[in-house]
Amino acid sequence: MPKRDDIKTILVIGSGPIVIGQAAEFDYAGTQACLSLKEEGYRVVLVNSNPATIMTDAEMADKVYIEPITLDFVSRIIRKERPDAILPTLGGQTGLNMAMELSAAGILDECNVEVLGTDLTAIKKAEDREAFRDLMNELGEPVPESDIIHNLDEAYTFVERIGYPVIVRPAYTLGGSGGGICHNEQELIETVTSGLKLSPVTQCLLEKSIAGFKEVEYEVMRDANNNAMVVCNMENIDPVGIHTGDSIVVAPSQTLSDREYQLLRDVSLKIIRALEIEGGCNVQLALDPDSYNYYVIEVNPRVSRSSALASKATGYPIAKLAAKIAVGLTLDEVRNPVTGTTFAHFEPTLDYVVAKIPRFAFDKFEQADRRLGTQMKATGEVMAIGRSWEEALLKAVRSLEIGADHLLLEEAENADEATLERKICFPEDDRLFFLAAALRRGQTIEQLHAKTKIDLFFLYKLSKTIELENRIKENPQNQEILAEAKRAGFSDAFLATCWNVDEQAIYDLRKAQNLFPVYKMVDTCAAEFESTTPYFYSTYEEENESTRSAKESVIVLGSGPIRIGQGVEFDYATVHSVWAIQQAGYEAIIINNNPETVSTDFSISDKLYFEPLTLEDVMHVIEIEQPLGVVVQFGGQTAINLADGLAKRGVKILGTSLEDTDRAENRDAFEKALEILQIPQPAGKTATSVEEAINVATDIGYPVLVRPSYVLGGRAMEIVESEEALKHYMTNAVKVNPKHPVLVDRYVSGQEVEVDAISDGENVLIPGIMEHIERAGVHSGDSIAVYPAQRLSSQVKNTIVDYTTRLATGLNIIGMLNIQYVVDGEEVFVIEVNPRSSRTAPFLSKITEIPMANVATRVILGENLIDLGYTPGLAPEKQEIFVKVPVFSFAKLRSVDTSLGPEMKSTGEVMGKDVTLEKALYKGFVASGTTMHDYGTVLLTVADRDKEEAVELAKRFNRIGFTIMATKGTASTLEEANIPVSQVKKIGENQETLIDYIRNGQVTLVVNTLTTGKRPERDGFQIRRESVENGIPVCTSLDTAEAILRVLESRSFELESMNASEVKQPKARV
């Protein structure tokens, strides 16, 4: 049927900031959808609050609104733009929930807006646990025995009938938020309480646990003509009980018989047809491994994380086609863009195996609860493609960047028997490595199957990998064994360890027998039809399907999996760099391994290699492509860390030279450069031992800021206030990167300022200067950034421009650089220089309209800024105010301290823009999920050093009508200042304590600056965690609290009676 011509304007709702459970896959989906709709001639309006996305680029839609995805703001956009329809199914849970809110508030009816893709009734049937259960019962499809509960009493009633364990699944939440498996009453109370709070409809499904069943997913598509097809089926290695986002996943499924596959396929198609979904849908099923019994677990009536994985695994662009189906086109009339000849209703066929492994942030959160369950904890994921399951798995392992190039983790190999058993029986993020360790110690696959319920097939494959390891060790430099190992996915680095030689020796050995990988094409049809997809993976076979073109090429290294400190901002820069390379007339080639991102959409680059970002794997691509050079500036620390090895192998690193990169990142070299350039920095030195660090700290005075070289996201960075704390830090931190010393700096508590700049070697362009609201000491990624800077004098700005220009030219930077300064009065000190793209580049690019990664790439390729049309120096400042507000995923990471410091903790960001700082901040806070109450109770419990400052904040909160609550010490200080305050008991005291007030909803904002709460037993830690668990905003920096206060003051009105007494009282504002 033809596409609809009765609609002209479509509003696409984005997914907002990156959080655990909702990451870059929705930038990929949203970008595809916007381009797909524009391709069909529709006027597209986009709303999304995340500036770090490709989808919020001005070219992606006819109108782009970077505004909060809240009922208030989206309603305003609808009333202004008057769209004929909205498409909410490509914005994750955020998009679906917003569509439901708009409908419930009557906005869609008022403005006569139609919902495309999946109608609201279908969304309700899939998302509302009770409606979903009723639908399954109607269809005669089995669901686990369950009950809908709205309070704890109903939960007790269900458990009395069924017994433990039970699974809690909150309605309308993301990534299993608030859910979990409960084995006892204490766990039930905690999980149900949390789940009901996080569910927007205060509803949970309690179901009988079927943990141990196989978990299988089907990604399905349906159009308005009721044509339905399976894009991909995937099998979780981990059985039911671990969230699919935290599971190792294989596509296509490996252990289903044809009968099982067809049975579950028919069920999935039956469900999508019953829901009348038009577009993409994900069906999750549980299969009894010992019979043909199955249960339907849940349905996502939208494009999801699994959709992105299925798209990259098959090459079938689900989001693009879902958008076309939403406007009336059918699967049998839309061509498959991969083959260009077949139509979209042909089900993809795979002649390879895909493995996905999640990436967790536990390297940053040592205190976090690492146990896996039904609530997702991974921040990102990697994908690898091979001809066998074991090859794909080993390629995925070395893509993770966790210091393992094989199924070998030191902690697992050295673990005692008790730890080994615990790690195997109670899964954590690293269970795969403990399974391998158990096999090395002689445990059988039958024993491991009994403990884990992982299918014997996967355990058998693991055991064969371990067997091959042993044969490798027993037969050093054996050519046949070497060839077998390479076919099985073993890395040169691991083989070198086995044979006690260096990696180059293994390469030479392979070269002598011409043992190199070939590249196969991902074509959706297992070579049944001719395809020209420029999408490749490596394997050790005979026929190579990737041929070098006559055009000169440039390779861009991607940034790998999303993790804290290296997020979607780097993928944004990678994509823009690719576009710039193409504009300059070169062939652009990407190497990356993240299935969620826009950069791994094969239509973005001229060629895509889906490969691990290791020296060996990257060099293989370079050898076949023979590029002009490699760009490493946009792939975060992942790419920068490869530069040295590539250069040693004769590869040309484009842009800033390796020597100059090292001058910026190596402390001693950087200090010498600053001396020559006469630019001040806080006093400090490098240290390679505990004794050396103590001597440096004694010389410059405490507090000191300590951090290792060559890290991203403040990894292992800390403010240390005493010799004892420094000793403790040094015994942990120096392990982080033993090749580089630890930096010990005097901590300057001034105002932090951040600058991104582009240099062509002679001219330096500074798009903007951003100031941080939080003073120095809070990681820049966790600080609220403001542009243009509001509190800097002209003299300070001029100094910053001068220093930035001198640093860029003095360090011979070609391309991008990011500099962080601290301003103390009128003095400016440089803290660090990063000779690469930064986290703030997308934010600055959007607001200054200078496409930084694009311009930097053109400069890297040899052009100069003036010829490109840019005037060196600071670009003219915009009139509007823009803020970048961090977003955290603390609710998903229990046991993690929420206090902010030098180590980064945020997973994403949002942008607020308006004509005043207060309005921009309001938008930023609201978009980040902070609830802005106009009245209520503020709980203040602050460190002694902050009490004086807290008095002024308390006065202002009181003036606008807030009640102040404080613990004894803080309360005494406030009483002395004549501020009305209610004193509350500390944790551990008799009667109601402050924790009770937090749990009972009597507190609307918590301000807590007790920075000694790193260990869970500390009071400060408990206060902050309870606040997060109960959805109460908590500020661990007085600067953040002051920013919230400014917003609240701007929204209040002064009230004064006409018969005011002669003794004037302070005016009350509400």
Curated annotation (Swiss-Prot):
Mg(2+) 3 binds at Q820, E832. Residues 930-1070 are annotated as: Allosteric domain. ATP 1 binds at R129, R169, G175, G176, K208, I210, E215, G241, I242, H243, Q284, E298. GO terms for molecular function: ATP binding; carbamoyl-phosphate synthase (ammonia) activity; carbamoyl-phosphate synthase (glutamine-hydrolyzing) activity; metal ion binding. Mn(2+) 4 binds at E832, N834. Residues 547-929 are annotated as: Carbamoyl phosphate synthetic domain. Mn(2+) 3 binds at Q820, E832. Residues 1-401 are annotated as: Carboxyphosphate synthetic domain. It is an enzyme of class 6 (ligase). Mg(2+) 2 binds at E298, N300. Residues 133-327, 671-861 form the ATP-grasp domain. Binds 4 Mg(2+) or Mn(2+) ions per subunit. Mn(2+) 2 binds at E298, N300. Keywords: Amino-acid biosynthesis, Arginine biosynthesis, ATP-binding, Ligase, Magnesium, Manganese, Metal-binding, Nucleotide-binding, Pyrimidine biosynthesis, Repeat. GO terms for cellular component: cytoplasm. Large subunit of the glutamine-dependent carbamoyl phosphate synthetase (CPSase). CPSase catalyzes the formation of carbamoyl phosphate from the ammonia moiety of glutamine, carbonate, and phosphate donated by ATP, constituting the first step of 2 biosynthetic pathways, one leading to arginine and/or urea and the other to pyrimidine nucleotides. Composed of two chains; the small (or glutamine) chain promotes the hydrolysis of glutamine to ammonia, which is used by the large (or ammonia) chain to synthesize carbamoyl phosphate. Tetramer of heterodimers (alpha,beta)4. This is Carbamoyl phosphate synthase large chain. It comes from Listeria monocytogenes serotype 4b (strain F2365).
